[in-house]
Regions:
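Hydrophobic anchor at the start of a short beta-strand
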Residues: 28-29, 121-122, 183
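ATP-binding N-terminal substructure of ATP-dependent carboxylate-amine bond-forming enzymes
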Residues: 1-99
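Phosphate-binding site of ATP-dependent enzymes
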Residues: 166-256, 262
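Short amphipathic alpha-helical segments and helix-helix/interface helices
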Residues: 15-19, 85, 111, 134-137, ...
């Protein structure tokens, strides 16, 4: 009997992953809110349920008789990893914990973790409203700042501004999937913006602005212990089998970590 694999998100971007998994003799159970999802034809079974419908995903698992010997996978939006982790936990499937996924999605959580575990970050405040923003800006002598919502994914609610010309009317203060509770206010850190992909015992560095792979910063990255620090985070979250992306800013003698991608 073929092992089952719950595949979350069956849009066009996910089709190459579906095709690859289909060649490995899995019984693919697809899940997508769109009943006419483009990848539906590659699934052995299909359920019209969104990756953020946690109860609905569990119902699918029960109906399809998932067990700990089966799998769950998603190549959809990062938010889909929450659904995958919740599903895996319910059926005792090997997968990073829901707590670890929540940590990687919520800036307030991972900046707090970084701060407590010696991972360098810019000067940071959690902001709930415009009054708190005004108060924190007065505490800093920095010229430039970034204001980012707790679940922001660029360009959603990411603002860069000069402290002498704050765009007060331009900030969104409602609440939605990208801003759930806090904004994160950070002093701008000067340096080169890089993305580091860490996987297994390897890593690759990319220029954040151009997306081009680069090796010119390896010496500084190694000497500052950046990779060891990032691998320690990955290990503690039990994500050693994943490719994890980190956005950092690097200068001659220091660095800060800004973001995590799964």
């Amino acid at each position: 009997m073929r092992r089952k694999l719950l595949f979350l998100g069956c849009n066009y971007d996910q089709i190459p992953y579906l095709e690859s998994i289909d060649k490995q003799n899995w019984k693919i159970v697809g899940a997508d809110l769109n009943q006419n999802a483009p990848g539906r034809h590659l699934c052995d079974k299909f359920h019209s349920v969104g990756y953020d419908d946690l109860a609905g995903l569990i119902e699918v698992g029960v109906r399809e008789k998932f067990t700990k010997d089966d799998m769950v996978f998603t190549a959809a939006a990062q938010f889909a990893q929450k659904g995958a982790a919740h599903f895996a936990s319910n059926f005792k499937i090997s997968f990073p914990s829901e707590e670890s996924i929540d940590l990687c999605l919520d800036k307030t959580k991972y900046y707090d973790w970084f701060s407590k575990n010696g991972v360098p970050i810019p000067k940071t405040w959690n902001i709930k409203d415009i009054d708190e923003l005004k108060k924190c800006l007065k505490l800093s002598k920095s010229e430039f700042f970034y204001l980012k919502s707790d679940f922001s994914k660029n360009p959603h609610y990411v603002y860069r501004f000069n402290s002498l010309k704050v765009p007060w009317e331009g900030f969104f203060w409602g609440r939605d999937r990208y801003l759930r509770e806090f904004y994160v206010l950070q002093e701008e850190f000067q340096g080169v913006s890089l993305r580091i992909n860490v996987y297994s015992d390897r890593f690759n560095v990319f220029d954040f602005l151009t997306g081009s792979k680069t090796n010119i910063h390896h010496k500084e990255i190694i000497s500052l212990g950046v990779i060891d620090t990032l691998r320690d985070f990955i290990s503690q979250q039990k994500m050693q089998d994943w490719l994890i992306k980190f956005d950092i800013i690097l200068n001659d003698d220091s660095y800060v970590v800004l973001d995590i991608g799964m």
